[in-house]
Swiss-Prot record:
Biological role: This protein binds specifically to 23S rRNA; its binding is stimulated by other ribosomal proteins, e.g. L4, L17, and L20. It is important during the early stages of 50S assembly. It makes multiple contacts with different domains of the 23S rRNA in the assembled 50S subunit and ribosome. The globular domain of the protein is located near the polypeptide exit tunnel on the outside of the subunit, while an extended beta-hairpin is found that lines the wall of the exit tunnel in the center of the 70S ribosome.
Classification via CDD domains: Ribosomal_L22
Keyword set, alphabetical order: Ribonucleoprotein, Ribosomal protein, RNA-binding, rRNA-binding
GO annotation, biological process: translation
UniProt-recorded name of the protein: Large ribosomal subunit protein uL22
The organism's place on the tree of life at top rank: Bacteria
Subunit organization: Part of the 50S ribosomal subunit.
Underlying gene: rplV
MF-aspect GO terms: rRNA binding; structural constituent of ribosome
GO terms for cellular component: cytosolic large ribosomal subunit
Entry-linked NCBIfam families: rplV_bact
Length: 109
């Protein structure tokens, strides 16, 4: 049985999120949590929260054994982009792009 968890609108670029997602794809959840706990990237903490949510969903909703769960699928999609302006010299302005992403994770036996 498979259980899903998702987090949408995360203030992280999809490219940086995919770097972290590739670290835990296909791993047992205990090992994946250990990898994410010691990964220095910003996205690691975010993915860890999603993984913990998926584990809690599997345990509460499906009565799954945590020791048998693995990360079946994890993918990071591009979300909306926040566009901001910053002041520059001589009355000009530059655009600042603040990307977001959506993280989807599935755990199962």
């Amino acid at each position: 049985m498979e259980t899903r968890a998702s987090l949408r609108g995360v203030r992280l670029s999809a490219q940086k999120g995919r770097l972290v997602a590739d670290l835990v794809r296909g791993k047992p959840v205990g090992q994946a949590l250990n990898i994410l706990a010691f990964c220095p990237k910003k996205g690691a903490g975010i993915v860890k929260k999603v993984l913990e949510s998926a584990i809690a969903n599997a345990e509460h909703n499906d009565g799954a054994d945590i020791d048998e769960l693995t990360v079946k699928t994890i993918y990071v999609e591009k979300g909306m982009v926040l566009k901001r302006f910053t002041a520059r010299a001589k009355g000009r302005g530059n655009r600042i792009i603040k990307p977001t992403c959506h993280i989807y994770l599935t755990v199962g036996n």
